[in-house]
Amino acid sequence: MNIRESWWEKYKSYILYAVLLIIPIFVMDSYFSSGKISYAQNTDGLGQHYAALQYIREYQHKIVNGIANGTLFQIPHFCYTLGQGADPLTTLNAYDFLDPICWISVALFPNRLTRSYKLMIWIKVFLSGEAFCLYSNYIRKTDGWRTAMGGLLYSFFNIEYFFYFPNFMHGCYLFPVILWSIEVLMKENRKAPLAAVTFYSFLTNYYFFYSNVILSMVYLCIRLRCKKSTVRENIQICKNVCAAYLVGGLLSGVVLFPTVHAFLNNYRIGLTTGYIESPFLYPMNFYKQLFVHLGKFHGMFAYLTVIDGIPLGLICLFLLIMQKGNQWKIMKIATVSSLLIMCIPLCGRVLNGFAYAANRWSYPFALAVAMVYVGLVDKLCKLKKKQLIVLTMMVAIYMCIAHSIGGNSSDGYSYDVLLLLTVLVLWAVNTVPLFKAHGNLILGEVTILSVIVGICVICSSAYGNYIKEFMSVDDLNAYYTTPSISKVRGSAKQREFYRVEKREANLNVECANQVRGTTFWWSIMDKSFQRYCTDLQLNTLAMNCELRGLDGRRALLDLAAVKYYTTNSPDNEGVPVGYKKIEDGLYGNTHYLGSAFLYKNSILRKDALKMNPLNRQEAMLQGVVTDAKIHNIKTIKPKKRMTALPYKVETKDVDLTKKRISVKKEKGALILHFKKPMKGELYLWMNGLKIKEADKSMCSLIFGTSSDIWCRGQKKGDLRVSDYEKKSTEQSPYSFWYAPRDGVTYYLGKSEEGYDSVKVVFAKPAEYTYKSIGVYENDTEKYMEDISKLTPCRNISIGNDTVSGSVECSENEVLFLSIPYSTGWSAKVDGEKTSIVKANGMYMAIPLTPGKHHIQLKYSTPWLRAGILTSLMTISGILIYQVIRIKRRSKSAEHETQIRL
């Protein structure tokens, strides 16, 4: 064999896979392009993944501008466009913030981000198949054609889910590489590949490396169980694997340590949500559906389980059952184990970071099926008639059982037809001499055809209608270039620090436009931030990681340093009290306190919690609310600022009792009639409102029972339909994103708008329990009295990582800063270190003595220094180890030479 032939044999599978991938890419992209549809899914893709790419683009612009101007660009550790302020290194890590693929994709199309997003996805799909080829070629030397087909099967097994969430592809394309590096370690005793892939995994997306570590350990146990070696050898292999993981983890300490800190301080950790009936068994209907989806296109169903297989893969699984001998033992164990992981809720919960049980980890099963395909597809061309009959019977039995359970009609029986055609092809390949000589080629063509048919079924409007889950290019651009944000974007470049509240719930639009706003939708939400929202029972807390702004409540807007209120609607209804029109869609705060002001009094949080949540929010303007007493600061009892309004209830398709709300039909409603309030803001409080789980036994509990509730103020004789409605999403604990709160509050508008009733509309039939329902108004005069006692500090300058300025106090006072609390902040007053107090639930405060003071605050990512030090020490250790190793080798070589002489 000459050099050219050996090169071709070595890289044949990689090249063939890359060429074959063009076909499904063209087919799938044609569905998107023909309808001018982007690759951004209309929930997470729109609000998170696409926003993260926009954030990366802004960083690239700053880097380029910094180089052009001859100044070094320093990535800020703290960013005020992530919610009200967060650390980008930790908040965006799960969204591929440090992934080179994302940065390259954005750099190639900086002005066409939809193309960057598309390129990023297809690169990761491409890498998934290439990673499979790498692993498969090392495990088993087979024909490159079969390996390439296996790579194609593996890439598209989970394609339906990965287009929704591009960051989940990390697990898919890195998992085979991790297994390959483990095999290299076992056979060649080389730890470097595993350490390197560990480092890269932690750097780009720690979340999926965590799950891959667990899955790879399961794989290692299976390999050692089937490997003929001594106990001592197995222990040594385990030590080497752990050592490689440790070195890789320590190398990535600069990213790993801060993200671990953020994860531990994340509200969602340990939160029991999702399916909780049993740690070991899902509802029986889930297992029935799992069985059906093994032979079905459009395979996403309960608990985020995705199986988009092809008929030939299913037939290979049936053939695996028929195989005998130790050589198939490991493959059988791996396939069964990967399937069992999806069948046990506890496994889903552990792999998901001890959060809700989910099956995002179906790619190990996909890998097992693809490996079975590569190992057995050749045998499918050499079947005896008896084996053909048995396989045909197994297929027939499967189809009968699947149809008796629920059938495969949702894909137009396309999978069934293709499965039967595949069986006919197998008969032809094994019995007709004309086809026998080209069996592998024919089955490869059947594989490609199956992938194409699967894509067509999933994307077809008649069956899967997958495309409807994605945003059109025009709608995507409109979402991020909303006029209301455009009006304030230029203002955001001013040196003055302020935030913007918008009426529309375009989540993370502020982040993408580099405007400081109030919405937040990222997986990691600090505990303090969440506690703030649940203490106030905000209706805008839609999920345990999603906040749709501050509901236009004047007190909360003042505390958050909101200077402008924007809306795309020409209707002035719902504009917060105290905001004056500047131009259409833009309103300014007439009593803007600024980002820093002084309190004379403090309130203990335990005292504030004794009040209802509406009085609680007003109390934060009477005194700074803290967990403990502040030395030398007067502690007061908060006064009630809310007045309850008596009302009469009218129901529509709703049964109402003292403790229960039973909604009978869609858009059932409660109408609360009251006397017109004369001043202030109008609020609704549904105390203790909880939605009851509809049916705990059903497989449909993907997200648990949930329903939207809309509220709006009304006035008699006004027949127009206003688009100004306040919304909340009530979820049962079975929902993945359940946020426990003891009720919900809504701001309905200014009392001067003349409302005399509140209409509460329930989106769909459901059962609710509650403690009480109240309509409240606050007193504008009392509000102005409270804020007049607060002293704005105009000489405070807020940068990305620093706060500095001068403050003059007439007595012992507390400096309040509208910056989210974090242990990463440190403070100095007149050059001396001082403590920072968590204030009003989520912000920061510094106690001050009488006189003039110079204030300095600096932010450093928590645990970042320890991470940097660990990474540097690990690099030094590796270099020292390599130097010693090289010296030992040279001495050993010299010694051998002397012996020979």
Model-derived regions, located:
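Membrane-interface coil-to-helix junctions
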Residues: L21-F132, L152-C172, F263-R268, I276-Y303, ...
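Active-site-proximal, structured, solvent-exposed surfaces of multi-pass membrane proteins
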Residues: N2-E9, L53, K640-L901
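Contiguous transmembrane helix-bundle modules in multi-pass membrane proteins
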Residues: N189, F208, I330-L346, V350-Y480, ...
